[in-house]
């Protein structure tokens, strides 16, 4: 089973960083409803668009997704 996006994102956490992906990871950690078992782009994108006011731009998710895909390769 591939690593979930959430598991990958947690490797990007850094409470001391203002880097966008790190900030996204820090906030996703605090989001109790985040789809932690998801590995597919569309359901994650839909969730974030509808439920993640902490994500100022979907471009940040796109960047994190590309990092996730690279980590799986």
Swiss-Prot record:
Pfam families with a match to the protein in the record: YozE_SAM_like
Superkingdom of the source species: Bacteria
InterPro entries per UniProt: UPF0346, YozE_SAM-like, YozE_SAM-like_sf
Similarity section: Belongs to the UPF0346 family.
NCBIfam families in the record: PRK13672.1 (NF010193)
HAMAP family for the chain: UPF0346
Name of the protein this chain belongs to: UPF0346 protein LVIS_0790
Organism of origin: Levilactobacillus brevis (strain ATCC 367 / BCRC 12310 / CIP 105137 / JCM 1170 / LMG 11437 / NCIMB 947 / NCTC 947) (Lactobacillus brevis)
